[in-house]
């Protein structure tokens, strides 16, 4: 063993740091296996060489008793050209290049692996998410200055190593922890293990979403970047150095910290509500948590027992002003009730119908009511009279109101010749009605009396109503609304068919010829053709007249 140790010390250092690191690991593993001869059989599964090496490194002493070892320059991890100091000159001469964790480690004696100990591993992919970082609520730490490191490490100047390519990580190490770890006689040692860091990361913090990052976790990240051995170097060497009493004290204090509140500088949101929401938020304090700087979306809920003088005064004034009003309204409620303002929705529908009926009782120019009694018929816009009313009108019963009666028979000539009412005019074409009534409008000789026009056909269902509407439209077109030449127009209900059986004495000849008589089919076709032609011509003339007006 001594010869192999001497040969390894005299071997020249290699330029490749990764190969030197693996060679040293194998050499240390061989030394440990040669020393550990007492354990020949283990009930558990044998450890791999790298795991065995990790267990050996976990029991190594941090202090050499001589010159204290310097902490790595953690601020220059992101710089590829940043130099990393090597071991002391005696280590360099021996040709051994240790890992970043091994710079602080020295063999204290023989090592016998513990059979009950199991290596704690963390997944390589989740290393960044598991490792904690310093929160904003932790005490302020001082960064190790480069000047102090240069003064205390003059003896370590020598061969430099290239820093591996890795993402720069900003770390803040407490000065007290650095002093306690690397001083020859530390007074207070800080015991921080990876397990406790993982537990703290799981608990999290309500203010910062970034997990804290400590020195041990940073070393694990660097080992992972070097050669992928982060899974095997998860145990902190400081846990092995501390005595059982100190570990117990630290574990109890850690339990108190974990069971207590997470933040010692937590600020209640209720206190922030007192801050004015209108205050400018352009200059936010960097130490103020982000969630407390956000604008409040809801109005702050005031306690029920908070009575301001203004509110009390306002309540008293309103209550005092309402009391006399209530006293004044009480007798009015007993005597008379207030009437609601009338709106269109409150009007009774029956009243509206009555008013409409009243307007419908007026003649076309809205100046007088109808002189003859009317009844409802098939066409709601026209006024109907019965045969009895027409017979009374012919007999002169309405002579005091009516000056002259015009009975217009809208049937075809062969129907008119077959039987018609006495004194009726046969006008079955629209042009004939226009020429008779509108070319020279007729007026009553006496203002108190009226001119009445009564239309009818065989049933008063089609031809009579059409002629009545035509005359009203032409009359409206020739006069300014609502003036009319003939404001009073009527329809004989049931037509000649219903009037002839009851009043034959008022018909001449006393007979009845229907429209669809077998003897007058040819004449029926001829008159229908003429009527359609006249209607087409009339529409054409109306269109031409409208174009001329434009």
Curated annotation (Swiss-Prot):
Question: Does the record bear Hydrolase in its keywords?
Answer: yes
- Positions of region (Disordered): 76-98, 285-335
Q: Locate the compositionally biased regions of type Polar residues.
A: 322-335
SUPFAM superfamilies from the UniProt entry: Rhodanese/Cell cycle control phosphatase (SSF52821)
Q: Does the keyword Membrane apply?
A: no
| Pfam families in the cross-refs | M-inducer_phosp, Rhodanese
Please name the top-level EC class of this enzyme. Answer: hydrolase
Q: What is its EC number?
A: 3.1.3.48
What are the Rhodanese domain coordinates in residue numbering? 401-508
List, as start-end ranges, the regions of compositional bias called Basic and acidic residues: 290-310
Sorted alphabetically, the keyword list is:
Cell cycle, Cell division, Hydrolase, Mitosis, Protein phosphatase
- Provide the GO MF annotations for this entry: protein tyrosine phosphatase activity
Q: Which PROSITE patterns match?
A: RHODANESE_3
| Reaction(s) this enzyme catalyzes, per UniProt | O-phospho-L-tyrosyl-[protein] + H2O = L-tyrosyl-[protein] + phosphate
Q: Which residues form a coiled coil?
A: none
InterPro entries with a match to the protein in the record: MPI_Phosphatase, Rhodanese-like_dom, Rhodanese-like_dom_sf
Q: Name one GO cellular component term.
A: cytoplasm
Q: From which residue to which does the signal peptide run?
A: none
Name used for this protein in its record? M-phase inducer phosphatase 1-B
């Amino acid at each position: 063993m001594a010869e192999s140790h001497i040969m390894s010390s005299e071997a020249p250092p290699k330029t490749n740091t990764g190969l030197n690191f693996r060679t040293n690991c194998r050499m240390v593993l061989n030394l440990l296996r040669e020393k550990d001869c007492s354990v020949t059989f283990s009930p558990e599964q044998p450890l791999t060489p790298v795991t065995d090496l990790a267990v050996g490194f976990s029991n190594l002493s941090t202090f050499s008793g001589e010159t204290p070892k310097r902490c790595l320059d953690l601020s220059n991890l992101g710089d590829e050209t940043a130099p990393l100091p090597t071991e002391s000159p005696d280590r360099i001469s021996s040709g051994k290049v240790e890992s970043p964790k091994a710079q602080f480690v020295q063999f204290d004696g023989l090592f016998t692996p513990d059979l009950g100990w199991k290596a704690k591993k963390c997944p390589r992919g989740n290393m960044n998410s598991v490792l904690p970082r310093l929160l904003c609520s932790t005490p302020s730490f001082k960064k190790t200055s480069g000047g102090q490191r240069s003064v205390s490490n003059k003896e370590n100047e020598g061969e430099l190593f290239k820093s591996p390519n890795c993402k720069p990580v900003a770390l803040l190490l407490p000065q007290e922890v650095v002093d306690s770890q690397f001083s020859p006689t530390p007074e207070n040692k800080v015991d921080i293990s990876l397990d406790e860091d993982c537990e703290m990361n799981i608990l999290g913090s309500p203010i910062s979403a970034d997990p804290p990052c400590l020195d041990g976790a940073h070393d694990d990240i660097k080992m992972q970047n070097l050669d992928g051995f982060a899974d095997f170097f998860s145990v902190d060497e400081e846990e092995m150095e501390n005595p059982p009493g100190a570990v117990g004290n630290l574990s109890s204090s850690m339990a108190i910290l974990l069971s207590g509140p997470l933040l010692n500088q937590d600020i209640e949101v209720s206190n922030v509500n007192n801050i004015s929401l209108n205050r400018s938020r352009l200059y936010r304090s960097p130490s103020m948590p982000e969630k407390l700087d956000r604008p409040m979306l809801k109005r702050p809920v005031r306690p029920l027992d908070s009575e301001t003088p203004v509110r009390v005064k306002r309540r008293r004034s309103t209550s005092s002003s309402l009391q006399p009003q209530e006293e004044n309204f009480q007798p009015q409620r007993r005597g008379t009730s207030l009437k609601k303002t009338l709106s269109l929705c409150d009007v009774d529908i029956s009243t509206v119908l009555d008013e409409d009926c009243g307007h419908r009782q007026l003649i076309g120019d809205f100046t007088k009511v109808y002189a003859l009694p009317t009844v409802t018929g098939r066409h709601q816009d026209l006024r109907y009279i019965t045969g009895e009313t027409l017979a009374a009108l012919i007999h002169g019963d309405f002579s005091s109101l009516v000056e002259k009666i015009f009975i217009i028979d809208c049937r075809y000539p062969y129907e008119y010749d077959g039987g018609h009412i006495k004194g009726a005019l046969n006008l079955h074409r629209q042009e004939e009605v226009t020429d008779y009534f509108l070319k020279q409008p007729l007026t009553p000789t006496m203002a108190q009396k009226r001119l009445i026009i009564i239309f009818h056909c065989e049933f008063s269902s089609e031809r009579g109503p059409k002629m009545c509407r035509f005359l009203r439209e032409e009359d409206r077109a020739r006069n300014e609304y609502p003036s009319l030449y003939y404001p009073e127009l009527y329809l004989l209900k049931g037509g000649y068919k219903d009037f002839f059986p009851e009043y034959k004495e008022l018909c001449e000849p006393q007979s009845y010829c229907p429209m669809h008589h077998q003897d007058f089919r040819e004449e029926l076709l001829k008159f229908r053709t003429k009527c359609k032609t006249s209607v087409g011509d009339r529409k054409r003339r109306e269109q031409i007249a409208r174009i001329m007006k434009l």
